[in-house]
Amino acid sequence: MKHYIRFDWAMKRLLRNKANHAVLEGLIGTLLNEKFIIKRFLESESNQQSENDKFNRVDFLAENEKGELIIFEIQNTRELTYFHRILYGVSKVITDYIDLGDDYDKVRKVYSINIVYFSLGQAKDYVYHGKTVFYGLHEPHDILKLSNKQSKAFFGDNIENGEKTKREAGDVFPEYYLLCVNNFDKLAKNNLDEWIDFLKNGKIK
């Protein structure tokens, strides 16, 4: 466990060094399969003096070209209410980045990436993705999609005449990524695996 604590604090230094932004953008881009440009950090309870402080984590906020926000967190001490804290963190960012008089379409899309170095629930895999899906109770294969007008207004999609958007209503809602680093115990087969291996062992192959 001592190795992970050292690496957690090394990541804190990495996050706060603007010269290393490309490294983190590479990790985020690999995970989400799209380009993100880091714009600013979230300064919160992450500035602790001890590895065992209550909020032992690394937080920063990144923004892409579309104005979407991403929260990045590292946690190496077990916490029973971790899922609740993730939910709170996303909710807080949503409310922090909208003004009182703004219309609801100004609510930002938020991604939450969480790297954990402890057993989380009954996890067997090492990467989990969570998102909101609206499906019909009477027609479970019917996934609720946006209208063409909503798709254009919210995502800037250009839809040809006669076509319907493939955007789901759930695409408006936050998405969550959980990287259970300790569950990774195999050879890296793709770029994402190489990142997980790096997060676990601190070595670049």
Residue ranges of model-derived segments:
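Elongated, amphipathic alpha-helical interaction scaffolds
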Residues: M1-K205
